[in-house]
Amino acid sequence: MQKAMTINGTEFNVVSLLGKGKGGYSYLAERDGKKFVLKQIHHEPCSYYTFGNKIEAEQNDYATLKSTGIRLPKLIDTDVKQERILKEFIDGPTAMDLVKQDKMTDAYIGQVKEMCRLLYPAGLNIDYFPTIFVVQNDVLFYIDYECNNYMEEWNLENWGIKYWSKTKEFLDYVNGSSAQ
């Protein structure tokens, strides 16, 4: 892991790897005592998802989601040449962590359902997997920018909610089976 990365010539100290997704690696980065998420796009194959231009998709999906009013981290900067984006860091446990620790509440489920009430009329689904939702000060944020055209089979009620409690699907995932 690199100790420093730049976005459009501005250097950020890389603290740790936060996670790897379908489209890139997300790092906790710092500059002047402030925390950020720095995402480096990757081009590793993904058997269940087809990508076009990932940087363009990040920018377009952010604008689309922002227009719906769901809570998500601010897109601060994009470095097209290096295929990196800089996002606001939302500090807190993931919904996955909360389920594992038996701390998932009806209030958090209600907040993701409220996001659906904003997304579905716009013809959108997001990735409802609980690793990409973070709770900060009892407020749930969707920390990814991925969104897709609405399909009933991939909505919260038919797919995502299976991973928001200790269901068979959740336990299979935690014990090594793949959910995505």
Residue ranges and their predicted role:
Residues 62, 116-120:
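Hydrophobic core positions within the conserved protein kinase catalytic domain
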Residues 73-78, 124-136:
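A short glycine-rich, hydrophobically flanked beta-strand micro-motif that places a catalytic Asp/Glu
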Residues 1-16:
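Juxta-kinase regulatory segment immediately upstream of eukaryotic protein kinase catalytic domains
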Residues 36, 71, 85, 141-144:
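Protein kinase-like catalytic core scaffold
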Residues 14-56:
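ATP-binding glycine-rich loop module of kinase domains
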Residues 51, 70-109:
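Conserved structural core of kinase catalytic domains
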Residues 108-110, 120-126, 135-180:
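C-lobe/activation-segment region of protein kinase-like
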Residues 60-71:
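Structural motif at the C-terminus of the N-lobe alphaC helix and the adjacent alphaC-beta4 loop
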